[in-house]
Amino acid sequence: MGTIEEPFRPNLPNQVAFDHGLLTLQGDRSPPPIAASPSDRLPLDLVTLIFPSTSPRLSSLPLAPSFPTRRVSMSDNKGVVYLGDGKVDVQSIDDPKLELSYRGKTRQCHHGVILKVISTNICGSDQHMVRGRTTAPAGMVLGHEITGEVVEAGRDVEFIKKGDICSVPFNIACGRCRCCKEGDTGVCENVNPDRPGAAYGYVDMGGWIGGQSRYVMVPYADWNLLAFPDRDQALAKIRDLTMLSDIFPTGYHGAYTAGVTTGSTVYVAGAGPVGLACAHAAQLLGAAVVIVGDMVEERLAQARSFGCETVDLKTEASLPDMIEQILGSREVDCAVDCVGFEARGHGGDSGVEKPATVLNQVMEVTRVGGGVGIPGLYVTDDPGGVDEAARTGNLSLRIGLGWAKSLHFTTGQCPVMKYNRGLMMAILHDRCQIAKAVNATVISLEDAPQGYADFDQGAAKKFVLDPHGVLAASS
């Protein structure tokens, strides 16, 4: 179905949604229509049905008339490309355009912008794909943690301006569907033809080009982008602000939904970047004690560097026993799973993958009536799963224990927009030091393959790619 040029009007029927001046008819679960060619027209009977008083005029209008588009030179665009199990490479890739492709058709994306990528981070979720634990196809451009400068804007972008430095939520969202309007931007219904929810450079998340690159296109820019209020201030704190696209909101979401508040005792499973971000977020929320569990001593040392207690999950002592040694109690108020489906066993089983381990442990160590946050990634299709059940996301959970203890659980993607503005203000006004907490380590785009390899070996670092040398120049 096409689109037509029409200024916004109040009190039109509920079936009509506005896409920055492009009037879009709703009715199916497909991605929103993209501006059609000038020859496309709405059928007269459909126009008459929805706009009986104005249908003669509307039906004669062409859809989305063509305008000249200013292009920005990006002939040196490069990106991190997944080549197959364990392999990534930095390769030349196509320049981004203000276009969307759907079912073989390419149309203009007037609501989008093109960003010069200032920083883009390697995420543990990327590692799941690189390890071959998803159905990601070779040739995919990776990267969903993006901060950049606007260098080109579509004609329907009203509030984001050229030169703005912006954080890009990893969730791609339309801003118009029910989920977006209710704040659940992680499961937008209009940006992925196969399932709710989309992300840049991630398997099964809509086919959007990733942002571990020099330039990237962002749709629905006025809705999706968080523009930093002051350019110089943003560049001075860019190592912290780059964490707003994913891991800081994701860690905060895990702690917040678990119920962390003033005086809480908290257990965080996993001392990777998301776990460390969650621990720091728990401190920001007022937790009295934050305990972080992991098997890599370097990562545990990083957690201790900003005031966390730690437990080594390679030891034979039970997790409740280790928590009791710290708190004098075997249970905490809140627990957060920041590990996900590649979890390993405890103690003697620490070298064996047991994907339900963390979920069962957090239920065990959370007090009656407590809360559990689960930002750790779980999938429905794992080619490398330990058994047939795990390969389809079916795990052996002690759900009866969770029920008996009246625990509340929150799972799923973090809706980044729910938290990123507040966390930005906390960064800009020196209320937190997220880059220090996660040990942000800047490397060049060309060094991304080595960053992936080091991260896979358990490095206690959050690798931040610097495609244009902006971060190196500001250090």
Give residue spans per PLM region.
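Low-complexity proline/serine/threonine-rich segments in eukaryotic and viral proteins
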Residues: 14-69
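Glycine-rich beta-strand-centered segment in the early N-terminal region that forms part
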Residues: 94, 98-121, 130-181, 186, ...
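Glycine-rich cofactor phosphate-binding loops and adjacent beta1-alpha1 units
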Residues: 258-260, 285, 301, 306-407, ...
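N-terminal Rossmann-fold NAD(P) dinucleotide-binding loop
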Residues: 275-276
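Short beta-strand element of Class I
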Residues: 288-291
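Conserved acidic E/D residue at the C-terminus of a beta-strand in Rossmann-like folds
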Residues: 294
